[in-house]
Structures are given as C-alpha cells and as structure tokens.
Amino acid sequence: ATIDEKTGVYNNKFFRTISEMELEKAKRGESLSLLILDIDNFKKLNDSYGHLIGDKMLKRLGIVMKENTRKYDIVSRFGGEEFIILLPKTNIKRALIVCERLRRKVQQDNEMIKYKVTISGGLTTYQKNDSVKRMQIRADKALYQAKKLGKNRIEIL
C-alpha cells in the first residue's frame, strides 16, 4: 500500500522510496525542495473538538494539499499531524511560492476555517552531497523556527 488511509496522501514508506529516486536526479543537477509542515495547535484541536474532528481535519488537509500541488509533487504523511512534501524540479524561490499558497489555502478553507486550522512549515532545498535525511533535518529545524516565531508561517533553512 502506498496511501495513508487517514489522510489520503502517500505514506511514509512510499515517500522514502520515491525521495531516493528524486535525490539521484538532484545529484545530476535538477532542483529539489522539501517541505515539512504540521497543523498548528493540533492537540488543542483534538482536546477541544474531539478526535473525530481532528481526523476530519487531517483528511481535509490531505485534500487541500493535493489540490494545491502539482501532479509530480510528492505529498506524504510524515506521522501524527506532520506532512512532508517533496517538490521536484523546484528551486527554493518557487518552492516558497508553492508553500505560501498552500498555507493561505488552508487558512481560508471553508471546512477548516470553523476550527481556525493553520499550518506551519519548514522548507529546504537540495545542496551538494545532501541526503534525504539531511534535508529532512534542516526542514524540521525550519519548522521548529516557524512554530517559535508565532506559527501559521513558512521558514527556510
């Protein structure tokens, strides 16, 4: 199985396989960016409205992400309320545009607006001799910065 049942996006196992293939292309000079994002205050959302609403928001986020990324972008669940998106053929400038659009779409989504759902993201791009793991570590640090700086934002590292 390649799809995460709760969210409708790719699962982590599929992401690991496909990301290694995309990394090889990046090593040959193609642009590659990576975004880790999560739902802000997800625990509070679950505590306030219950897990059914939390699950519904995860599913809705999956839909919004798929609708607002290109067909060759790899949208996957990273775990919990965290998602990871691989953006092939995308430099950091273009990736930031994609990420900001996604952040705004979530904030304005009719189903999510009732629960004040927002997302924060950490963005990075391939650097010489990178591994997927190194890219994930940088994106995760950038996500932590976005949370620390007030949430509902994208940070780059």
Question: Residue spans of the language-model regions?
Answer:
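Conserved nucleotide-binding and Mg2+-coordinating catalytic segments in signaling enzymes
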Residues: A1-T17, L37-H51, K59
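Catalytic/regulatory signature loops of cyclic-dinucleotide turnover enzymes
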Residues: R138-L157
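Short, conserved alpha-helix that lines the donor NDP-sugar binding/gating region
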Residues: R16, E20-L23, Q136, D140-Y144
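Signal-transduction coiled-coil helices of two-component systems
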Residues: E22, V106-D109, A146
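Conserved phosphate-binding and hydrolysis motifs of nucleotide-dependent enzymes
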Residues: N46, G50, G54, G79-E82
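Short, conserved catalytic or interaction motifs in soluble domains
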Residues: D47, H51, P88-I92, E111, ...
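GGDEF/GGEEF active-site signature
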Residues: R60-R134, E155-I156
